[in-house]
Amino acid sequence: TPEAVMQLAYEGAVYGESIGADIPSASVSKRILLAKEIVNRNRTRGISDTLDELVGLLGAGMQAVESIPFSLGVFYAVSGDVQKGLLAAVNGGDDADTNGSICGNICGAFSGVNALPKRWTSRIERENRIDFLPIAKQLLNR
């Protein structure tokens, strides 16, 4: 569930903070919890209001302390829907390509390859001359 993903992301951030270098910065783990609170507070108000508050309170910049909680918040707001997540993350502004990439990857991992429109994957494979399915299978078998 998206709830479980948020919990695991929080736990991973707590672990990372426990072993990482102690630098003066906001806590990614606490900001993940804040992202979740923001989304829950805005469930009835729509994605636009949710994005406004995520950006306003967390930021949407390239620094991990902003991009990770923001992208996870968008993932949670759209319940892992790849198309909605990509659109929302990019429309959040600031470092749109970073956040779109992070959120898109989280949503894609959660929802699976079949959640991507075939016209998207076909074009990417055609334009890049890459068949990603064997590469993905090889990565999974490592």
Q: Where do the protein language model's features map onto the residues?
A:
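Catalytic phosphate/nucleotide-handling subdomain of diverse soluble enzymes
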Residues: 64-142
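Phosphate-rich cofactor/ligand-interacting catalytic cores and adjacent structured alpha/beta frameworks
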Residues: 1-70, 76, 125, 129-142
